[in-house]
Amino acid sequence: MPFPFGKSHKSPADIVKNLKESMAVLEKQDISDKKAEKATEEVSKNLVAMKEILYGTNEKEPQTEAVAQLAQELYNSGLLGTLVADLQLIDFEGKKDVAQIFNNILRRQIGTRTPTVEYICTQQNILFMLLKGYESPEIALNCGIMLRECIRHEPLAKIILWSEQFYDFFRYVEMSTFDIASDAFATFKDLLTRHKLLSAEFLEQHYDRFFSEYEKLLHSENYVTKRQSLKLLGELLLDRHNFTIMTKYISKPENLKLMMNLLRDKSRNIQFEAFHVFKVFVANPNKTQPILDILLKNQTKLIEFLSKFQNDRTEDEQFNDEKTYLVKQIRDLKRAAQQEA
């Protein structure tokens, strides 16, 4: 009878046990270089063996029974959490292996069940350790890869959104290291757009706190953060699931004033993204009085400004149609005001 675990002849239980022991050695501060080197080697070897069980090799496909055993061993031993907690102690290639193992195990399904998602729901600290990974440059991008895989699953996205730690994203997207800030923004955007109903519920329940933090991003000194935040704001407001949030946002005069200022930003790209938020205020058929007052007060200036706004975008038909429509809407405001008078 052929041995089910291939060339290595190591069962999933052995691999997990060896890996856990080697990680425990690396966790000790006072070990000799020789011991650390040996433990690092063992960690690498066992991570590769684990990957072979999950992904198979050129010669053979992954075996369901071995994968199931490995997953169970990872849950029972707590090793999944240990690998995340000690990610900094693992070498460069090993960090990539951990992310691949984690994401593979996370995607695993039995019928309609996703056992690893259920497991992480009971071990929520794993999510928060991944999130905190953005504070450590050497593991930030690995943690981002695992975090986004978690967010694909609604129960895990909900845990993060409703946590206090979610608000750490407002710091992470402003980090000075471009790669890390961009990665954090990609994760932040995923959280707010992947599960539409969940995001809408979150934004409705936490509107004031979320948007007071979000406004700081729109004032950011960092061009990329400012532009990405403005673009995402436009997407959030125009998503039909967020109708209640959009209605509330475009009823506030301070938000309109901010967009009018951003229309005159020194960056053309920022101006362009601001235009896509500004148009929602103008196109709204049920404008609040404070919004109407601002538009009427600046009516002539706005018509003149929009008529000349980025006129070199001749190829962009939709933009030009929208601009023409906004000019007409703003021009017609006067008539509406006069008729009422």
Curated annotation (Swiss-Prot):
GO terms for molecular function: calcium ion binding; protein kinase activator activity; protein serine/threonine kinase activator activity; protein serine/threonine kinase binding. GO terms for cellular component: cytoplasm; serine/threonine protein kinase complex. It comes from the Eukaryota. It is found in: Cytoplasm. Keywords: Cytoplasm. One of its GO terms (biological process) is cellular hypotonic response. Pfam families: Mo25 (PF08569). InterPro entries: ARM-like (IPR011989), ARM-type_fold (IPR016024), Mo25 (IPR013878). Coiled coil: none annotated. Component of a complex that binds and activates STK11/LKB1. In the complex, required to stabilize the interaction between CAB39/MO25 (CAB39/MO25alpha or CAB39L/MO25beta) and STK11/LKB1. Component of a trimeric complex composed of STK11/LKB1, STRAD (STRADA or STRADB) and CAB39/MO25 (CAB39/MO25alpha or CAB39L/MO25beta): the complex tethers STK11/LKB1 in the cytoplasm and stimulates its catalytic activity. Belongs to the Mo25 family. This is Calcium-binding protein 39. The lineage of its organism: Eukaryota, Metazoa, Chordata, Craniata, Vertebrata. The gene is Cab39.
